[in-house]
């Protein structure tokens, strides 16, 4: 049978069976029109039979027949508004937004200034020379040598122009993710692409420029041992290594309304390392990563980004490495930019200020390579919203020149708009250059700062980053098994040293291995996570609850028998 869908995208026909779930049919239509609104925001009804409209999410689990739909029915699909007649301050809340986003959205982020010698008033007065600056102030940005303003400062700057506080009119989301797809369901009276096209369905010409804001301002590794242990793989084997970063997002006070990614752990998926790269079974890795994500969520952590090495020993015998990445070569290669964009597309950032309910991503990319002094250093990046849209529309691909991205040729499935970028010529004049057939990937890169905690305001989630082997390091002669578990845990258990036991249990990789053994039941697992993620002395006190459980007693008995 055929169902017809009528919406702001025009009318489309979708083939289906009466026994199919309506959610499956709806997904087929969503894919046709490239609609990104969630089911909760869609209202579906059959206008010709005066059936009351219902939320699509409520209809998804029922079959087409159960909903009383027949061959040829016309379904009208509308979308709920994201805001009402409210003032600017009342932007619609999103339950999936991160806590740090909700916190920063409520703040003004004004930059306080002290009295200057130009002030002519008392201590309680204020003038143009000492009044607070908005968080997007370009003068402050240059003074502090900030390459990018924070995301929330960017949003507030857009809101200042899009939604006037005094007007009290309907809230207009100031953000809209760029979309470079051609609309194959254009309502204009012409055949769809590639047989026809018009100004309504084709994306506009793209002018690439450095993105002014960044979704994350800083990457903070909670302990230097994290990075050092990750690099040890290269030191031991000479092979490159890849890992995922786990942690949380927090506010970053060195930038107005800034956000930092706090890295608590690094997890390395199954991989085959080589001297100039690595290979992975993407299907197997996807399954493993999903399992680790779920366990990390129990610990209050999430996947923040990825990290990989690009190291080559200089041969001088002093531990120095070659500097491959600099302003005259590249910072991220075109393939790495595309990989980062795909990861960012997979990790959307929920955002109340976007008309789609999401905007860009907080997923970060860290590279461990040599700096200009020949030292091993970390560099942190993201890619721009334009990079995400170019990759999503399959417009760019990697090239043999790592600093250049190749623009794909148009096809029946791919429309390639005009792409330009601005550069300075040999006379110092800014000119617009046609990007075809390739353009510098630097236009797609957003650089972040990185470092380690300056003050221990927030204690790290884990106390031990070494001792118990990291996962998937069999090629290095390291494996996770009962013997290693016995070596790490049994001495402190036998001695009754619960302070040391607490420290050794506070290990991300040890927790992952204990979870894989399936010895502890759900309640004991929660107690173990509480012990591992709670700092002393409360974490030590929680050990007493853990060791009284039958699952823990079974584990101790197994370790005592392990030989």
UniProtKB/Swiss-Prot annotation:
- Give residue ranges for domain MPN: 219-359
Matching entries from Pfam families are given as: NPL4, UN_NPL4, zf-NPL4
Compartments annotated for it: namely:
Cytoplasm, Perinuclear region; Endoplasmic reticulum membrane; Nucleus membrane
Where is it mostly found?
cytoplasm
Topology in membrane: Peripheral membrane protein
Could you cite one Gene Ontology molecular function of this protein? ubiquitin binding
For this UniProt record, the keywords arranged alphabetically read as follows: Cytoplasm, Endoplasmic reticulum, Membrane, mRNA transport, Nucleus, Protein transport, Translocation, Transport
**Its GO biological process terms?**
mRNA transport; protein transport; ubiquitin-dependent protein catabolic process
Family under the similarity heading: Belongs to the NPL4 family.
- For this entry, the protein name equals Nuclear protein localization protein 4
Species name:
Eremothecium gossypii (strain ATCC 10895 / CBS 109.51 / FGSC 9923 / NRRL Y-1056)
Q: List the top taxonomic levels of the source.
A: Eukaryota, Fungi, Dikarya, Ascomycota, Saccharomycotina
């Amino acid at each position: 049978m055929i169902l017809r869908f009528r919406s702001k995208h025009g009318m489309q026909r979708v083939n289906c069976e009466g026994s199919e779930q309506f959610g499956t049919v709806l997904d087929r239509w969503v894919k046709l029109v490239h609609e990104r609104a969630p089911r909760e925001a869609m209202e579906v009804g059959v206008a010709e039979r005066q059936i009351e409209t219902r939320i699509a999410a409520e209809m998804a689990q029922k079959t087409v027949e159960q909903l009383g739909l027949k061959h040829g029915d016309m379904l009208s699909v509308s979308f709920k508004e994201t805001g009402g007649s409210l003032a600017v301050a009342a932007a619609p809340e999103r339950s999936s937004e991160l806590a740090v986003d909700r916190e920063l959205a409520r703040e003004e982020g004004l930059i306080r200034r002290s009295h200057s010698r130009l002030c002519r008033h008392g201590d309680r007065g204020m003038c143009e020379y000492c009044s607070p600056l908005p968080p997007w102030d370009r003068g402050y940005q240059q003074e502090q040598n900030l390459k990018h303003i924070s995301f929330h400062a960017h949003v507030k700057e857009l809101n200042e122009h899009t939604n006037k506080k005094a007007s009290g009119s309907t809230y207009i989301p100031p953000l809209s993710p760029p979309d470079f797809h051609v609309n194959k369901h254009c309502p204009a009276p012409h055949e769809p692409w590639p047989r026809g096209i018009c100004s309504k369905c084709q994306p506009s010409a793209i002018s690439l420029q450095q993105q002014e804001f960044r979704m994350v301002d800083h990457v903070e590794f909670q302990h230097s041992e994290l990075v050092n242990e990750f690099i040890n793989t290269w030191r031991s084997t000479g092979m490159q290594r890849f890992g995922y970063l786990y942690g949380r997002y927090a506010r970053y006070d060195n930038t107005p309304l800034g956000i930092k990614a706090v890295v608590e752990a690094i997890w390395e998926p199954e991989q085959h390392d080589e001297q100039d790269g690595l290979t992975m079974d993407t299907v197997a890795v996807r399954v493993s990563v999903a399992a680790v994500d779920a366990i990390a969520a129990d610990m209050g952590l999430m996947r923040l980004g990825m990290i990989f090495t690009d190291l080559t020993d200089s041969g001088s015998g002093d531990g120095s490495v070659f500097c491959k990445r600099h302003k005259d070569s590249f910072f991220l290669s075109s393939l790495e930019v595309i990989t980062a964009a795909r990861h960012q597309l997979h990790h959307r950032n929920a955002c109340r200020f976007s008309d789609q309910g999401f905007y860009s991503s907080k997923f970060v990319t860290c590279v461990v390579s040599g700096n200009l002094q020949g030292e091993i250093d970390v560099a942190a990046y993201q890619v721009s919203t334009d990079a995400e849209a170019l990759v999503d529309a399959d417009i760019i691909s990697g090239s043999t020149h790592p600093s250049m991205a190749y623009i794909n040729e148009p096809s029946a499935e791919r429309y390639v708009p005009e792409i330009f970028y601005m550069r300075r010529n040999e006379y110092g004049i800014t000119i617009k250059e046609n990007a075809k057939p390739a353009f510098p990937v630097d236009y797609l890169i957003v650089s972040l700062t990185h470092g380690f905690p300056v003050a221990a305001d927030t204690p790290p989630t884990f106390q031990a980053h070494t001792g118990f082997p990291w996962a998937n390091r069999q090629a290095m002669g390291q494996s996770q098994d009962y013997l290693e578990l016995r070596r790490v845990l049994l001495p402190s258990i036998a001695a009754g040293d619960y302070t040391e036991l607490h420290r050794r249990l506070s290990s991300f990789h040890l927790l992952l291995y204990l979870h894989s053994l399936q010895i502890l039941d759900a309640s004991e697992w929660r107690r173990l996570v509480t012990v591992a993620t709670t700092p002393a002395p409360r974490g030590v006190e929680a050990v007493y609850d853990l060791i009284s459980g039958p699952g823990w007693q079974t584990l101790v008995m197994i370790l005592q028998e392990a030989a």
